């Protein structure tokens, strides 16, 4: 029987560290449910000690998800570890993930600790955590750039104190596949008790090799856990992409010889959900989940695929969730058809009340555009008004007037803590006028650093999906809004971003 490769998803923790990718508790919970449907083995739900918001999100996910192991990150100190354990109390399967830097550069410049102090803190923290939960992961931050002799000592001590998983991060994406694979192999050979723990890889994509490095760590190094994110989401150039590493191992089972527990047919739904929640669009030619991933433009290729798909396709599109038969809904579609399509798309709403609310919004949209595509439905249920989070600001209605040669004017009605507010302003265009009207009342002081519009489907009556990125006091958030009217979508996106600025407490930055 082949070994199993453990898939550790850190979209909700490391992925969220991408500037602007912050998520609300309910958004995280919705994605966690999709990850459970995808059958990932471990979900790193957050960094419980970093903020009350992260603690609440970890606790909510731990109390809801039953199949996957739920993990919280923690620094190597008693306070962080105790906070993580508290957040994980409701979990069916709990893991605490402890990290401390071990490279000379990080120890000297960041921690201001000696190697001896780092070694002592490592073993003490694992010992403390082991008394709280049985499943402990230990990560020597910047492990790939650490002195091998010192790193072996730290890892040996961590395993001796009860660490069940040893994760070796390439924190800054410096590794090369062959070198990284040999590095993992060397550590496993030199650490005397290496067989007492599962070895894991965590690679960043700064040189574009996160997936290749992770696979080298598995094949050459003997790692049996890969840490990754949906769409490769993560700070800087991102993390190892879950969908790519999973399909590489599945498609080339002849080479890797490993089993996976992943339900790959739910990959596309997970990708779309993360993209629409964070506002980070998936590039068209992205492997596995990009819109062109299974498209053939060359006449020769098209002819070959029509005769036999395996002439130019190494995997089946439907195996990752693409469907050749798209069900198009419309205004005559009933609640049962809508609910069934939600299930097929991997969307789970908590209650009948939420389904009713989503269906009402679906019918409202169907009155405005004749055909409702999958992308429309996903955008609709990703809207924060369905998420259930407490919002300080909410969109009600908008009127805008624009005429050639005259300055556009907008009047908008929105709620502030449940009370209707009316505002109006002029601007350089209808979007500018609408957002100025909002800002004239809320006085957020935030700077807009990104405004982008994407058509959700391909026709002129398509919904527009707007992403607004705001920066204030060093914090960056993305807001996403969708509507057939781009001006309305822009206002919704702006409110979404404002709510995140209000709701998100400052966080402790974590690396890994």
From Swiss-Prot:
Domain of life, per lineage: Bacteria
Annotated coiled-coil segments of the chain: none
Signal peptide bounds: none
Pfam families: HCS_D2, HMGL-like, LeuA_dimer
Major enzyme class: transferase
Functional pathway: Amino-acid biosynthesis; L-leucine biosynthesis; L-leucine from 3-methyl-2-oxobutanoate: step 1/4
Pyruvate carboxyltransferase domain sequence ranges: 5-268
Sorted UniProt keywords: Amino-acid biosynthesis, Branched-chain amino acid biosynthesis, Cytoplasm, Leucine biosynthesis, Manganese, Metal-binding, Transferase
Classification via InterPro entries: 2-IPM_HCS-like, 2-isopropylmalate_synth_dimer, AIPM/Hcit_synth_CS, Aldolase_TIM, LeuA/HCS_post-cat, LeuA_allosteric_dom_sf, LeuA_bact_synth, PYR_CT
Cellular component, GO annotation: cytosol
Region ranges (Regulatory domain): 394-512
Repressor found in the keyword field: no
Main subcellular location: cytoplasm
MF (Gene Ontology): 2-isopropylmalate synthase activity; acetyl-CoA C-acetyltransferase activity; manganese ion binding
Record: residues binding Mn(2+): 14, 202, 204, 239
PROSITE patterns per UniProt: AIPM_HOMOCIT_SYNTH_1, AIPM_HOMOCIT_SYNTH_2, PYR_CT
GO biological process, one term: L-leucine biosynthetic process
Protein location: Cytoplasm
EC number(s) per entry: 2.3.3.13
Cofactors required: Mn(2+)
Disulfide pattern: none
Function according to Swiss-Prot or TrEMBL: Catalyzes the condensation of the acetyl group of acetyl-CoA with 3-methyl-2-oxobutanoate (2-ketoisovalerate) to form 3-carboxy-3-hydroxy-4-methylpentanoate (2-isopropylmalate).
Family: Belongs to the alpha-IPM synthase/homocitrate synthase family. LeuA type 1 subfamily.
Subunit structure of this chain's protein: Homodimer.
Protein name: 2-isopropylmalate synthase
Species annotation: Verminephrobacter eiseniae (strain EF01-2)
Gene responsible for this protein: leuA
């Amino acid at each position: 029987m082949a070994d199993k490769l453990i898939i550790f998803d850190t979209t909700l923790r490391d992925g969220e560290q991408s500037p602007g990718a912050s998520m609300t508790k309910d958004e995280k919970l919705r994605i966690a449910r999709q990850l459970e449907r995808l059958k990932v083995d471990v979900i790193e739900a957050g960094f419980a000690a970093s903020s009350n918001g992260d603690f609440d999100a970890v606790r909510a996910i731990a109390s809801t998800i039953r199949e996957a192991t739920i993990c919280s990150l923690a620094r190597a100190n008693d306070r962080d570890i105790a906070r993580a354990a508290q957040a994980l109390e409701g979990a069916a399967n709990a893991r605490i993930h402890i990290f401390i830097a071990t490279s000379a550069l990080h120890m000297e410049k960041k921690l201001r600790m000696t190697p001896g102090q780092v070694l002592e803190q490592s073993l003490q923290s694992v010992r403390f955590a082991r008394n709280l939960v049985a499943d402990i992961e230990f990560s020597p931050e910047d492990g790939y750039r650490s002195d091998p002799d010192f790193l072996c000592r730290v890892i040996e001590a961590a395993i001796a104190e009860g660490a069940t998983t040893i994760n070796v991060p390439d924190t800054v994406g410096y590794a090369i596949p062959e070198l990284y694979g040999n590095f993992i192999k060397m550590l496993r050979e030199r650490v005397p008790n290496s067989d007492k723990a599962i070895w894991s890889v965590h690679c960043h994509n700064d040189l574009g090799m996160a997936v290749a490095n992770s696979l080298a760590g598995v094949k050459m190094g003997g790692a049996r856990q890969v840490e990754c994110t949906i769409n490769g989401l993560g700070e800087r150039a991102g993390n190892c992409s879950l969908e790519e590493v999973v399909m590489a191992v599945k498609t080339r089972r002849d080479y890797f010889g490993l089993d996976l527990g992943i339900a790959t047919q739910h990959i596309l739904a997970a990708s779309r959900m993360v993209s629409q929640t964070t506002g980070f669009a998936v590039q068209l030619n992205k492997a596995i989940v990009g819109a062109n991933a299974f498209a053939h433009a060359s006449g020769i290729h098209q002819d070959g695929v029509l005769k036999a798909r395996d002439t130019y396709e190494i995997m089946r599109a439907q195996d990752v969730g693409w469907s050749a038969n798209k069900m198009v809904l419309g205004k005559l579609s009933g609640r049962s058809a809508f609910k069934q399509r939600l299930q097929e798309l991997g969307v789970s709403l908590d209650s009948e009340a939420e389904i009713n609310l989503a269906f009402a919004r679906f019918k409202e949209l169907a009155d405005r555009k004749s055909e409702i595509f999958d992308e429309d439905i996903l955008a609709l249920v990703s809207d924060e008004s369905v998420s259930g989070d407490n919002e300080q600001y909410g969109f009600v209605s908008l009127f805008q007037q624009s005429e050639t040669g005259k300055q556009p004017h907008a009047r908008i009605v929105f709620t502030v803590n449940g009370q209707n507010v009316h505002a109006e302003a002029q601007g350089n265009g209808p979007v500018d006028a609408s957002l100025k009207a909002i800002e004239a009342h809320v006085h957020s002081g935030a700077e807009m650093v990104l405004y982008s519009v994407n058509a959700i489907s391909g026709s002129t009556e398509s919904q527009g999906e707007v992403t607004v990125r705001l920066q204030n006091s060093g914090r960056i958030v993305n807001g996403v809004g969708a509507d057939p009217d781009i001006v309305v979508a822009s206002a919704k996106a702006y409110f979404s971003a404002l709510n995140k600025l209000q709701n998100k407490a400052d966080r402790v930055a974590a690396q890994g």
